[in-house]
Amino acid sequence: MNDVTTATDESGIFTSEDPIALFHEWMELARAKEPEDANAMALATADASGFPDVRMVLLKEADARGFVFYTNLESAKGLELKENSRAALCFHWKSLRRQVRVRGDVIPVSKEEADAYFATRARDSQIGAWASKQSRPLAGRFELEKQVAVFAAKFGVSRVPRPDHWSGFRVVPRHIEFWRDRPFRLHDRLVFEREKPAEAWRTKKLFP
């Protein structure tokens, strides 16, 4: 049973029955209030044995299809997502005293999407994507700088193509929770849930 109307009446912050629209409302507020990187999110993954891992990444796109980030596919997170294609995200905006948590299945973005985003990156970042063997042992800073120089010379002034080992993932949400801090830890929590992308969202409130 949907409970959004009741939640809106009580708190005044759950203003949409569409969790993606509500997320964008909160993100716009965060962009106005947070000093930098309002789109930073904790990405939690697990390997095939279930051992968890977490790190901060940047959200690059969010729409009805899901939440997109980009990475080296040979990194720890890339390999973990290959073994276990589920993940969780957490956005925390301290200035707003709000957070959003997402859980869902993870699918790769299309080559066309990855190419289009890669083309928008700074040239030095594009070269860095070729130079960095992300998450693998590094003898010293010089080794990385040497690789950067190698690929900078290779591409010269020509266009830097996207390497095959660099692309993006889309977290297709099954569960999205909106949380707002309240006095005495009597926080507001609203959850949107569904099993499949084609299903309608179900909502419920949770005890803090």
From Swiss-Prot:
Q: Which residues bind substrate?
A: 60, 117, 121, 125, 185-187
Whether Flavoprotein counts among this entry's keywords is yes
Q: Which GO terms describe its molecular function?
A: FMN binding; pyridoxamine phosphate oxidase activity
Cofactor(s) in the UniProt record: FMN
Q: Which reaction does it catalyse?
A: pyridoxamine 5'-phosphate + O2 + H2O = pyridoxal 5'-phosphate + H2O2 + NH4(+); pyridoxine 5'-phosphate + O2 = pyridoxal 5'-phosphate + H2O2
Which residues fall in a coiled-coil region? Answer: none
The note describing how and how many cofactors are bound reads: Binds 1 FMN per subunit.
Q: Which Gene3D superfamilies does this entry report, sorted A to Z?
A: Electron Transport, Fmn-binding Protein, Chain A (2.30.110.10)
- The enzyme's first-digit EC class, named in words, is oxidoreductase
Instruction: Give the EC number(s) listed in the UniProt record.
Output: 1.4.3.5
Q: Which residues bind FMN?
A: 55-60, 70-71, 77, 99, 134-135, 179, 189
**One Pfam family in the UniProt entry:** PNP_phzG_C
Q: Which domain of life is it from?
A: Bacteria
BP term (GO), one: pyridoxine biosynthetic process
Subunit record text: Homodimer.
| Similarity field | Belongs to the pyridoxamine 5'-phosphate oxidase family.
Task of the protein: Catalyzes the oxidation of either pyridoxine 5'-phosphate (PNP) or pyridoxamine 5'-phosphate (PMP) into pyridoxal 5'-phosphate (PLP).
What is the protein name stated in its UniProt record?
A: Pyridoxine/pyridoxamine 5'-phosphate oxidase
The protein's organism comes out as: Parvibaculum lavamentivorans (strain DS-1 / DSM 13023 / NCIMB 13966)
Name the gene for this chain: pdxH
